[in-house]
Amino acid sequence: MGVQGLWKLLECSGRQVSPEALEGKILAVDISIWLNQALKGVRDRHGNSIENPHLLTLFHRLCKLLFFRIRPIFVFDGDAPLLKKQTLVKRRQRKDLASSDSRKTTEKLLKTFLKRQAIKTAFRSKRDEALPSLTQVRRENDLYVLPPLQEEEKHSSEEEDEKEWQERMNQKQALQEEFFHNPQAIDIESEDFSSLPPEVKHEILTDMKEFTKRRRTLFEAMPEESDDFSQYQLKGLLKKNYLNQHIEHVQKEMNQQHSGHIRRQYEDEGGFLKEVESRRVVSEDTSHYILIKGIQAKTVAEVDSESLPSSSKMHGMSFDVKSSPCEKLKTEKEPDATPPSPRTLLAMQAALLGSSSEEELESENRRQARGRNAPAAVDEGSISPRTLSAIKRALDDDEDVKVCAGDDVQTGGPGAEEMRINSSTENSDEGLKVRDGKGIPFTATLASSSVNSAEEHVASTNEGREPTDSVPKEQMSLVHVGTEAFPISDESMIKDRKDRLPLESAVVRHSDAPGLPNGRELTPASPTCTNSVSKNETHAEVLEQQNELCPYESKFDSSLLSSDDETKCKPNSASEVIGPVSLQETSSIVSVPSEAVDNVENVVSFNAKEHENFLETIQEQQTTESAGQDLISIPKAVEPMEIDSEESESDGSFIEVQSVISDEELQAEFPETSKPPSEQGEEELVGTREGEAPAESESLLRDNSERDDVDGEPQEAEKDAEDSLHEWQDINLEELETLESNLLAQQNSLKAQKQQQERIAATVTGQMFLESQELLRLFGIPYIQAPMEAEAQCAILDLTDQTSGTITDDSDIWLFGARHVYRNFFNKNKFVEYYQYVDFHNQLGLDRNKLINLAYLLGSDYTEGIPTVGCVTAMEILNEFPGHGLEPLLKFSEWWHEAQKNPKIRPNPHDTKVKKKLRTLQLTPGFPNPAVAEAYLKPVVDDSKGSFLWGKPDLDKIREFCQRYFGWNRTKTDESLFPVLKQLDAQQTQLRIDSFFRLAQQEKEDAKRIKSQRLNRAVTCMLRKEKEAAASEIEAVSVAMEKEFELLDKAKGKTQKRGITNTLEESSSLKRKRLSDSKGKNTCGGFLGETCLSESSDGSSSEDAESSSLMNVQRRTAAKEPKTSASDSQNSVKEAPVKNGGATTSSSSDSDDDGGKEKMVLVTARSVFGKKRRKLRRARGRKRKT
């Protein structure tokens, strides 16, 4: 955090520096503030936090530092000092409070979101009520609407497809290169080649064939002799034929992949196919044909010996090849109908195996004649008699097609009734018995269109038994198929039924059918089962739909309501419930849109699920023994059921239909039959044997009564939800719009509040430190762990000249003694803010002690500061109470306490405006705490001096790191790292022009002025006071020195009286002594510092000294001064130049009268040979001239 507001105070002293100018400098980095900035500031464009923001920030900043060739040293925080721990405890409390507030805000946000969703739902319902309903409007698909994707294609992506295609092309290219290099390298007879996919083999063989055509001469030389040319041609022809055979074999293999399953299915059904060929139709893009050769079917005996599932699969398929006129009309109107699947075509071929073309023509003529004469009747003649007999034999063996009927089918009595839906596989015959509102029973046999035509042909021969004119055209017409043509005599079928006691029940949901009339209800019919199933009493009935009926929607599920076939039935017997029927209103129901089958009749088809889930029939039975037999009871009146029918000639488009009963009705009619759903989502009805029926039924009834209480709670919740929905019905659209807009505004405000609270609650953990250190090691950058404060460690590195400055935004570093700081290094601006201690000390008059005093007033990590005190007020306080160290704060605290003791006394009129304002401040007890200043002045740091080493970034490990923490791929990581590595590898660097002289712009920036007038006034007054204080100190020091000198002069004044004669004698004796010493030596001249001078010069000098001393004595006696000062006690000897042999000497001697000591004599001389050299040069010049 640093000192609050200190950067604002120092910004006038900072200047902008280009990052390029910092190239090669060693800078310390306080990483702790980076981590805090990343946690609190790094957000996505929606304001939400991202994953690993500290590592992402560190990565980008490292790249920038290294790009400018700066050598950083990262410093991590150590243990916090005691004073800082107290501040951190308070911060932690604020963070915990923000975290709890964030959770509350999240709950409010969720509630607001739910309210908005409820408003949208109600708003949509209101708007839908206002607009006309478009549910019954039939919309045809647009011409350019694509078919829905398969599940595999939905989960696949373009990238995966592209990768697969790329791998395939790489393999192909490798093979082509190897083949082009050496055509004999590829052995098409090898196992490796045969293990390749057929498509790849086909491409390779095709390339080889083309290669042999065009480039054969490159590898096989032409024969030189003409006789061998024919052999050359034959060899090429044989090789070409050899390749063609392999290509045909591969094509057959590819064809087998697409059409081979037809052969397998047909063989599973008991048939035999000699050959199946499938090819694409050239004239159409999406069509293909299947040619089946050598079809042989099983005999009837073989069919009887086969098991039920296989026979039902074979004979339950469609047999009609030629469609009716109505179907032809439909195909003309719908050209986009789905073509028949291979399985359907296979069934057609099997059905028409024994039919002749003449019989087909006759049946076609009879069917067209009947279609023109009696449109309500059923068409006949679409299948030959031989085909019909085959159908009869097949239906004899079908165990799942089993319809119980009696003489009282048309009665529709009030007893228990039974509805059975028979189905074995996707194309098996299925039946649904329906009764309209008048109680007339209708039975619908649900099958494909070709089977309908077959059954209509049989039913037309039995019109006498059950007339079809009894039902009007608007309702469903009944066509009864004679049971003599479909005998069911196999007793093994009934025995197989005995083992199927647990039957799957159907969940029936109430839904309105817009296509049905209001008075019509779909209810089960009421056939009565006899003790034995007779051949002559079995009826198959076909449900036909008229032109007036609209297409329906069918909702289907995997569960169907069923009962057991073992018990024998007798009419007019009471029914009891043996198994509960649970209802699940929230079960997933799939709606399948469909189209009308044709304009005359629509056939509803039921589709079973992939030969696994057989659709059990819904059957009502009456019991003859009320004591031991328990049956399923179905109500007579059931709500209308939505039915949607779709005809598609392919067997994969059959529609499954689920009949649904409303929850409330079944709860009312069967209060004891509710049961929770099973794990499979289906409901199992447990059938009972005759001896065990009473005991097990009683236990089931007890369990159901206990579960009723549990099911009551969800019903109450549903009722409350319905009541809450009814409350919205009286609200108009304008109120809903207003409420929704208010909720939207509240939601946005809660989002912003939550984001702010998350920023406050974010904290730096030790794991973040470890991850950051790992990234630094990968970049090869040194880092150190500070003993306590990272800012103090950076400052000591700067003070000991181990670094050239510090990159940080924490202003605490100035208080620890830093001299150079770079701020806002990673802003988008082109320049970095550079601060020096010398600059703001000269401009603002702030030193380290004053900065610590500002921390007391403004607040920092070690102290809270004084409330409502900013940087300007703090500078005014320091101006009002000057002093050194803590003296200003002690004065301020003393003055404030005095002012608070007598608040009612009239303030001093001499007080300034600042002091009047300072009276309202609130100081904490113990202000100022000297421990704060001690912590700043004497921090715990590591002052050892060592060398730092920088390594080269490890590219591979950095890529792996970015993949693990950021999810980046190799390309994105390289985009950031390659410019950095390129810049680091540069060997030569060039100096910038601003390194030679200062720019004019920089000089203008250095001359920034303080914008605040109050601050400018306070700084000016403070600087003036400092100058005045410095001047007064200097003046006091000078006065003190003068007094000391006067005392010294008085003490030394008595010893300064000396005789003039003594002085003259001393000087003359000194000169004589020097002359006597020099006479004993043979001298011939000298330089500075030598004592050997000429005699003439010595004599002249002595005479000059004596004359000068005599003149001085005469002047002093003439002046008659009674006292001599220390300054006048020195005797000066004037220099007198003496010419002797062209050499001049000058000397000065000073004597100190106070101490009576001799001073060193300074002698300056020229070379004695100076004039002689000049004369010699002149003589030489004359000689040359002569």
From Swiss-Prot:
Instruction: Summarize the record's induction comment.
Output: Induced by replication stress caused by DNA double-strand breaks (DBS).
| Subcellular localization, as worded in the UniProt entry | Nucleus; Chromosome
Where is the segment annotated DNA-binding?
31-67, 820-836, 848-880, 912-918
Give start-end positions of Basic and acidic residues composition bias: 325-336, 454-472
Q: Where is the composition biased (Basic residues)?
A: 1169-1186
Grouped into one coarse class, the protein's main location is nucleus
GO biological process per UniProt: base-excision repair, AP site formation; double-strand break repair via homologous recombination; negative regulation of apoptotic process; nucleotide-excision repair; response to UV; response to UV-C; transcription-coupled nucleotide-excision repair
| Mutagenesis / variant outcome for changing W968C | In XP-G; patient cells show a strong DNA repair defect in response to UV light but not in response to oxidative stress; decreased nucleotide-excision repair activity
Q: Modified residue Phosphoserine is at which positions?
A: S384, S705
Give yes or no: UniProt keyword Metal-binding. yes
Co-factor binding details: Binds 2 magnesium ions per subunit. They probably participate in the reaction catalyzed by the enzyme. May bind an additional third magnesium ion after substrate binding.
Where N6-acetyllysine occurs, the residues are K8
Effect the entry attributes to changing A874T:
In XP-G; mild form; residual activity
Which EC main class describes this enzyme? hydrolase
Which metal ions or organic cofactors does this protein require, according to UniProt?
Mg(2+)
- Where is the region Interaction with PCNA? 981-1009
Region annotated Disordered, chain positions? 306-342, 354-385, 404-473, 510-533, 667-724, 1056-1081, 1095-1186
Q: What PROSITE patterns does the entry give?
A: XPG_1, XPG_2
Stretches the record annotates as Spacer region: 79-785
Which residue intervals make up region (N-domain)?
Answer: 1-78
Q: What is known of its domains?
A: Both nuclear localization signals 1 and 2 act as a monopartite signal which binds to the high affinity site on KPNA2/importin-alpha. Both the spacer region (also known as the recognition (R) domain) and C-terminal domain are required for stable binding to the DNA repair bubble. However, both domains are dispensable for incision of DNA bubble structures.
Q: Which family does it belong to?
A: Belongs to the XPG/RAD2 endonuclease family. XPG subfamily.
Report the protein name in the record. Answer: DNA excision repair protein ERCC-5
The organism's lineage is: Eukaryota, Metazoa, Chordata, Craniata, Vertebrata
